[in-house]
């Protein structure tokens, strides 16, 4: 962060390494350059009705009803000092949170799936994900997050897929679709 706090976030995959299943998004903080770390804590939870992606495979293991919180992406805002944080739920909904205290607390998740809906005129996705990895902030202040979209017909519902970005010009208040990389070109569909 701008204050020098290190934030380590990850998917905590319980009961296996697969992309679908009981997955939480966890965070640890360090304020001393990584010499010590806070306890791990779950930071992504969506209140209310969540739903399950219809393309989700049958889940096994200790909790077959568990949800998939996936693909976390963070951006440290050099201008405001905020930490912008995006994640997906069940590869079908995307959410945005913000921290103004170096990751100690985060705002309630805001559904930003509407940005992905803007892609539908070019690509009729059934599976979406932010990232993986990190987003960036441009000099103009624009926040840019890599995303991928899939038709969900192969590869554990992750294929065929294309890559793009979503972006915000108002510090995360609203999000919009970027351009799909090499649209309508079969050679670039994963």
Over which residues does each language-model region extend?
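Asp-box/BNR beta-propeller blade signature and adjacent active/binding-site loops
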Residues: 1-190
């Amino acid at each position: 962060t701008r204050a020098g706090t290190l934030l380590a976030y990850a998917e905590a995959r319980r009961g296996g390494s697969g992309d679908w299943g009981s997955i939480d998004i966890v965070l640890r903080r360090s304020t001393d350059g990584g010499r010590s770390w806070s306890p791990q804590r779950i930071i992504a939870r969506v209140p209310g009705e969540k739903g399950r992606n219809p393309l989700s495979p049958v889940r096994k293991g200790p909790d077959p009803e568990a949800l998939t919180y996936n693909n976390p992406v963070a951006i440290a805002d050099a201008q405001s000092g905020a930490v912008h944080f995006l994640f997906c739920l069940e590869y079908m909904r995307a959410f945005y949170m913000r921290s103004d205290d170096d990751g100690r607390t985060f705002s309630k998740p805001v559904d930003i799936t509407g940005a992905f809906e803007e892609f539908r005129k070019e690509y009729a996705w059934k599976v979406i994900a932010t990232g993986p990895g990190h987003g960036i902030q441009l000099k103009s202040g624009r926040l840019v997050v890599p995303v991928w979209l899939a038709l969900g017909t192969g590869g554990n519902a992750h294929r065929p897929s294309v890559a793009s970005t979503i972006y915000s010009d108002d510090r995360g208040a609203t999000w919009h679709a970027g351009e799909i990389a090499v649209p309508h070109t079969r050679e670039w569909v994963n």
